[in-house]
């Protein structure tokens, strides 16, 4: 069984606040979106690579019902997802 480590500082992290502000949601909601996405990634992106994963898939994985492009861009801008030089995406500091 896979597990996910969530640091106690997540709830007060500036990246969480930044993403929450961009999406116009409260920080606890943003934390839920992130944890849902990370739990999905354990099985569906185990290396952290998001190549071939669309913004719509990221949105569904996070259980976000807003604009998928906005969520993906927000996660990149806030630093939760890294965009490599070749345009592929990776979950920041995954494993």
State the predicted function of each range.
Residues 1-86, 90-95:
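Positively charged, structured surface patches that bind polyanionic biopolymers
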């Amino acid at each position: 069984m896979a597990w996910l480590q969530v640091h106690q500082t997540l709830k007060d992290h500036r990246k969480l606040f930044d993403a929450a502000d961009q999406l116009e949601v409260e920080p606890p909601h943003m934390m839920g979106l992130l944890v849902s996405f990370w739990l999905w990634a354990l099985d569906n992106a185990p290396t952290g690579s998001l190549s071939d994963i669309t913004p719509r898939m990221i949105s569904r994985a996070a259980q976000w019902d807003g604009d998928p492009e906005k969520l993906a861009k927000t996660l990149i801008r806030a630093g939760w997802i890294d965009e490599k030089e070749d345009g592929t995406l990776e979950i920041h500091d995954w494993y």
